[in-house]
Amino acid sequence: MKLPAYIDMPFQEWKTSFSFFNKVSVRFSETDMFGHMNNVTPFIYFEEVRISYFKKLNMMSENKQTMTVVASQQCDYLRQVMPYEELRIYVKTSAVGSSSLTLHYLGENLEGEPCFTGAVVMVQVSKESGKAVSWTDEEKETLLHTR
C-alpha cells in the first residue's frame, strides 16, 4: 500500500502510535447510492473524535477566548465501508507549531483493518478578532504528550 505523505514511518508503527479513539457505527444515512459509506462521512467522524479528544485534554471551554479552526484536511480511503459496520476512529497529535496543530486520524474496523486515514491542520485563533493566537507552553506540552 502506498502511504500518504503525512505518514512518515512504517504503517504498522504509525498505527500503533494511536491510543485515543471513539467507536462509531456507520448509519444507513451515511451511505451513498452504491451502498457503501459516502466519501464525506470520515470528515464527520474526524470532527467528532477531535472534539472528544480536545475535551479530554481540557482544551474546549465556552469561556476560552480562543478556538481552533480547520485550515486544511485530507482523507485517504483504503477499503470500502458498509452500512452498520462498527469502526474505531483514532486521533493523535502529530505536530504543534506556534499557533497551528496537525492531527492524524485512523479509521479501522473491529478486525483491526484500516479503512481510511486522514490529517488535519488547525489554527488557534481569537474568537474576537479571528487572528492567529500562539499556543501557550502548557498547551503545547499537553498536545505533544497526549498522542
UniProtKB/Swiss-Prot annotation:
Q: What is this protein's record name?
A: Uncharacterized protein YsmA
Gene Ontology molecular function, alphabetical: fatty acyl-CoA hydrolase activity
Pfam families reported for this sequence: 4HBT_2 (PF13279)
> InterPro entries annotated for this entry?
4-hydroxybenzoyl-CoA_TE, HotDog_dom_sf
CDD domains cross-referenced by the UniProt entry: 4HBT
In terms of domain of life, where is this protein from? Bacteria
